[in-house]
Amino acid sequence: MNLEGLYRLSAEIERRFPSLGKWQAQGLALACWGLIIQQQCQISRMAEALPEWGAFNTVRQRLKRWISNPRIDVTSACYEWIAWVWSSCQFKRPLLVVDETKLSDRLAVMMVSLAFEGRAIPLVWRCYYANSALDYPQQGQVLLIYGLLAHVLSALPAAVRPLVQMDRGLAHSSAMLRALK
């Protein structure tokens, strides 16, 4: 393992995420490093990539605790993430992509991403149980998307006016078109 790379990542995360405490930032760096090495986001796979940090079960448990830590201010961390991504790209007119993805019939994710070199960098998202009227966000699809986009826009410089792209199922709603004007 390239520990120097992990330490540089940890220092950069501490600098870019001032809302996180030192240990929270190190936990994020460890999770990111495991993700980068394994190119998978399953906690057990990430833990396999980090043997220098302890036994497999110890590292896996550490990652699980970090992910479920209620003391992490997710809203601030997302804002800081968006600002970091934006400062690294410097687009004049960014393209934001809105997409809803369902993972079988268990989980759905509504996500706003930044289109970059043929890829999408996730900026902000909301997860909920798929195919369940009770668990679907109460505000409905239009206000959910509007809220996610508003969160992204609040982190961008005031002069930036991004283009928004979404698939037909989301974009052809008259309520959506009114909300985005």
Tell me what each language-model feature is.
Residues M1-K181:
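Conserved, well-structured functional cores that handle cations and Mg-NTP chemistry
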